[in-house]
Amino acid sequence: MVERRLRSVAILAIAVAAVGPVFIADHSALGQAAPGNYGGAISLGGHGWSSFEGAPATPGREANQLEFSFRGGVATDYIYRGTTLSDHKPAAGGAIEATFGALYAGFAIASVRLPTQPTAEMTFIAGARRTIGDVDLDFGVSYFAYPGEISGTDTDYWQAAIRADKRINEVFRVAGGFAYSPNVSNTGAWSWYAAGGVGFDVPSRFLPADIGVSFTGGAGYSWFGNQSPELGGFPLPAYWNWQAGVTLTYKVFNLDLRYYDTNLSKEDCFVLTGDPNARPGGAINFITNPEGLTSRWCSAALVAKVSFALN
């Protein structure tokens, strides 16, 4: 039971949305903002500090010129697809991305509090961004590493993701995407994630100079295959997550206020996350949760994030 709890933990790390709300709003390939405005990205549910999310191709860049961007920030909680990766405590992170034409590669690091006790979450990404017609496409591959885990545990894994963003008019944007991992969190289970989101940008003519305001929201659905026999052989619980919030931007700085929630029961939340602080008293499932342990790691949360983005 203890081993299953430790190994199912980083399911919390599956991937596709924003600090770009990650920097500060999610690690993944599902986020779009107005050019240069990472804070207004539509979050589709990715890991929180990766430059992969919310970094569309910037107009005016030379096709064959190597360029770099940097992001960093702090948040009152690190929420990933409705579940906390920081035990509902503050978190910090940073990322660097290099682009050359349509190609990009990057690295992000974030503080986490997970059952396997890694020293940090490290994300390595590579991919390509192209615009076809009026749709921005982003395809990328990510590797999520958790160094310093408890001896005998290993939750590192790969993921591929694709997202599309489209601006409807001056104020409305939409985004959608998918992510797939053949062995999520090294549990032996495959995972799929599908998400969509919308954004509303307050026109600049109604705002002071250098100020931006964006309202964004989205929802996603995660489903999984069976874990390895050593971990019980049963599928992890499928679930919905959703979020909505507002991002205020001043030059290179962002302030994001966001509400997150899921439809997971407290019992299924424990099965998914392996929360080491789970409490007894829940409904017993003799296959997935024979002790009836419950977790609040998937409950509703209101998160404040402050970040910067340098291009």
List where the protein language model places each region.
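Outer-membrane beta-barrel biogenesis signature
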Residues: 22-70, 80-83
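Short loop/turn motifs that connect adjacent beta-strands in outer-membrane beta-barrel proteins
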Residues: 57-67, 116, 131-136, 152, ...
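Residues that define the transmembrane beta-barrel architecture of outer-membrane proteins
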Residues: 64-66, 88-92, 118-122, 135, ...
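Transmembrane beta-strands of outer-membrane beta-barrel proteins
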Residues: 68-72, 94, 103-107, 124, ...
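Transmembrane beta-strands of outer-membrane beta-barrel pores
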Residues: 74-80, 100-102, 109-113, 130, ...
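Detector for outer-membrane/organellar transmembrane beta-barrel domains
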Residues: 157-237, 259-262
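Outer-membrane beta-barrel "beta-signal"
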Residues: 200, 248-253, 279-285, 294-311
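Solvent-exposed loop segments that connect transmembrane elements
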Residues: 226-235, 266-294
